[in-house]
């Protein structure tokens, strides 16, 4: 079973694996990174271009559900659609979700407007055993 979490609310000991799906892990405590259950998988994170666009919108105070739905989501889905390595990881997660307890984590506190919700929707449509909110079911590649 896959569960979506923000990194500040995850205890690696509660999971078989913890997948950190963000580009940078510089701000993370070494005790988390040194845990053998923890994997850093930047291939399931937004491209630098999309991440910087998000940061720009957030810093300008204009980040909202319109930009999320009209700009961020379509760009991230397109990125996942065209990334062979990302698709390999998505398939691995789908397969492992049947026998392992896995946390997908990122720094974002608002899960609804975080790429992990999109990844969750993609995994749901791929047949993964995943705990998601209904609103994520619209995300697929």
Protein language model regions, located:
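Residues lining hydrophobic/aromatic ligand-binding pockets adjacent to catalytic sites
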Residues: 1-141
